From Swiss-Prot:
Native species: Chromohalobacter salexigens (strain ATCC BAA-138 / DSM 3043 / CIP 106854 / NCIMB 13768 / 1H11)
Compartment(s) of residence: Cytoplasm
Gene3D superfamilies attached to this UniProt entry: HUPs (3.40.50.620), Pantoate-beta-alanine ligase, C-terminal domain (3.30.1300.10)
Name by which UniProt lists this protein: Pantothenate synthetase
One cellular component term from this protein's GO annotations in UniProt: cytosol
Main location as per UniProt: cytoplasm
Length: 283
């Protein structure tokens, strides 16, 4: 596996791959990799000739009081994991290479509508940071396909709209959420949980499943969501939101909505956890 941090070297290497008509897949990450990230690499490996992963802790998507400084940097272990899953190239750019004029002066990309509400309401500017760095990486790598986990469902929808609106010729592939045996969605931030919190954390997914089952049984969404929020509070969570949205665009559900998605964000101690679950609403 090749490791590059220079933009010019990256472009030269991938130019040769495109010249040979090779299909290029991109897996953007912030590092501190777990089995969820590696599932993206595995999916890319099945589909492409050249698999490119990026490791970049993007300061533009962190808020002022968030965990940018403490976010784990585990480059050596990450590189070993990527190589063992068949990644061909890992790109590890410096911040001043991607943002040469600084964060405030850099052109930023904002995706309206789908980035508003949910995590967008609780993390102002987060999705602008995500859309900006992903646009940069799309421009530098010029992949045929890019792979994102569905655990970050709102982010996945932001990227899909970004690609559609800006006419990037890139296929966006969503990979199902990877979970621990007890149901907790895999996340780099799970490492922030204390041992006691880690034991309680699977209740987030269990609550989603309970709300899902109530909705499938015909319970009115406001009632099911209210009961879900109460259940989370009883189990020690501080919810940011628990909402039911249209799966296709995160718009509000309507009487004729069939395919919906439950989305939750909640704090357990100092750790913010997110999850989601698709639900087919009864007619």
């Amino acid at each position: 596996m090749l490791t590059l941090s220079d933009i010019g070297e990256l472009r030269n290497h991938l130019h040769a791959a495109r010249r040979d008509a090779k299909r290029i897949a991109l897996v953007p990450t912030m590092g501190n990799l777990h089995a969820g990230h590696l599932a993206l690499v595995d999916a890319a490996r099945r589909d492409a000739d050249v698999v490119v992963a990026t490791i970049f802790v993007n300061p533009l998507q962190f808020g002022a009081n968030e965990d940018f400084a403490s976010y784990p940097r585990t480059l050596e272990a990450d590189a070993q994991a990527l190589a063992s899953h068949g990644c061909d190239l890992v790109f590890t750019p410096r911040t001043d290479a991607l943002y040469p004029h600084g964060l405030e002066a850099h052109t930023q990309v904002s995706v309206p509508d789908v980035s508003e509400g949910l995590c967008g309401a609780n993390r102002p500017g987060h999705f602008t940071g995500v859309a900006t760095v992903v646009s940069l990486l799309f421009n530098l790598v010029q992949p045929d396909a890019a792979y994102f986990g569905r655990k970050d469902y709102q982010q996945f929808m932001v990227i899909r709209k970004l690609v559609a609106d800006l006419h990037f010729p890139i296929e966006i592939v969503g990979v199902p959420t990877q979970r621990a045996e007890d149901g907790l969605a895999l996340s780099s931030r799970n490492g922030y949980l204390s041992a006691a919190e880690r034991q309680r954390a699977p209740a987030l997914y269990r609550t989603l499943c309970q709300v899902h089952d109530a909705l499938r049984a015909g319970e009115a969404p406001p009632t099911a969501l209210r009961d879900g929020l109460a259940a989370l509070a009883e189990q020690g969570f501080k919810p940011d939101y628990l909402e039911l949205r249209r799966a296709q665009d995160l718009g509000p559900i309507a009487p004729d909505t069939q395919e919906a998605i439950l989305l939750v964000a909640a704090h357990l101690g100092t750790t913010r956890l997110i999850d989601n679950l698709a639900v087919s609403l009864p007619r």
